[in-house]
Amino acid sequence: MSRVGAIATIIISLISACASAQNSVGIFENHSDVGAVLHPGSTTFDSAKNTYTVRGNGENLWASADAFQFAWKKMSGDVEITADVQFANLTGNEHKKAVLMFRQSLDADSVYADVALHASGLTSLQYRDQKGATTSEVESRVNNHGQLEFVSGPNKYPVDYTGARLKLTRRGAYVSLSIGAMGLNATYDGESIPIALTGDFYVGIGVCSHDKDVVEEANFSNVEIKNLSASAAEPVLYSTLETVAIDTTIRRVIYSDRSHFEAPNWARDGSYFLFNRNGHIEKLAVKGGTPEVLDTGTADRVNNDHGISPDASMLAISDNSQPTKSESGEETHDSLVYVLPITGGTPRRLTKKAPSYWHGWSPDGKTLAFVGQRNGDFDIYTIPVAGGEETRLTTAKGLDDGPEYSPDGRYIYFNSERTGHMQIWRMKADGSGQEQVFSDDYNNWFPHISPDGNFMVFLTYERDVTGHPGNKDVMLRLMSLGGDKMTDKKITVLAKLFGGQGTINVPSWAPDSKSLAFVSYALIPPEDAGAPAH
């Protein structure tokens, strides 16, 4: 290289370094516009107020490409970013966003996860899990202009919809959202998703105007970014009741709690959910709130196999409270199937033998389908609701589970490991014509047919997982059936989550077949969680 060329290279490097230094602001290494914007954005820092002001343009931060102003620093590993976030005003598009973000690259279609505060009051965990994929989100309960109250110790405080204390946390493969009132503690609210961020990634704050012709402004105060060391404390289990829309895959948190609950049923009129916790059935309004315990009489060890009759007058439960005898004569408390009024009351026992686990009502409400272990094998049985003897429908070696009637009553769908790993099957209601619905490299459990008969949702584990344990990386997948002949069979992913046992053991479709309910789980270090969710 000539002397002149070497000098030119040095000058260019110095200019680039100076430009980068000029773009550093506060704790952030740089700021820039991401994606296509018509009007340049900006980020400034007021050290006296410890506040960043971000002004951003951009048509959207959504779909398969983003456009926004972003202030960032590169980090790796487990990371947490926290800030008080508030819009300068609530004029303009109600979908304008102020975000805390983890982003793989500065490409417009990059993998990312963020907590997004919207001018409408919506707060959500947004994510794009593959480069160029469509963004989805988990909507927080904190919306509708801060109607939800958070609990911090003995004090309750409402969340101001114009701003909030937000925290985005990455632990291993999962990113979670915490939220609280400005200036106070942010608490885990139930939003958690797996996202693959590799090596160095970008951590920062941003604003999107959601209107390509204007620039919008938000303030980020008391911003803290830190790497997280491995927690020495025992993680806390959180259970979260969510819904997911099958057309958009948008998830919404309904209820989250620092306890273990399972298996939601969606009421036939769409107004409430039922789920089990601590041996009881609890009822929760579809809008959330505080659950109420349903009276189930002497059945006080109800497990996660329960469901509402087609006419909404009765509830079938599986319960372990009564003494039973095993086939070898040992005293046990194995599961039995009962029915009781939907409003609560004394349960009436149906199955004579144990263990028995309810899974389906016939459309006419006259027959129950259940799983029973007899002579060492788990098979599918039916029994009249009025009482009578059980009828065995399957005889194949290996576990058969999860029987559920199709809405027209012609078929019973179930899962079976008769081929070597768990797959979805169906048979005619009398047990004849058993056929495998599809086969793939996963283990698939608990088929649930939509009320309109057009779709089937099911729980998917990785191939190497045995049984249906809890606390695993799982998927909810959706198959389009295309009628009784199953001419479509297109499968899509509705949600990726931490769960398994308890997530979707029983029917949980909304009456309109547009969404369904499920339970996700999270193991959160106490120092990440803040105060308990309620």
Where are these regions (language model features)?
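Acidic/proline-rich low-complexity IDRs
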Residues: S13, Q147, G183, P194-A196, ...
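Generic detector of low-complexity/intrinsically disordered segments
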Residues: S16, S124-Y127, F150, L168, ...
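Bacterial N-terminal signal peptides
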Residues: I7-A17
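N-terminal compositionally biased, intrinsically disordered segments and leader/signal-like regions
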Residues: I10, T135, Y188, T249-I250
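Sequence signature of WD/YWTD-type beta-propeller architectures
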Residues: S229-H534
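Positively charged n-region of N-terminal signal peptides that target proteins for export
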Residues: M1-V4
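Extracellular glycan-recognition regions
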Residues: Q22-S231
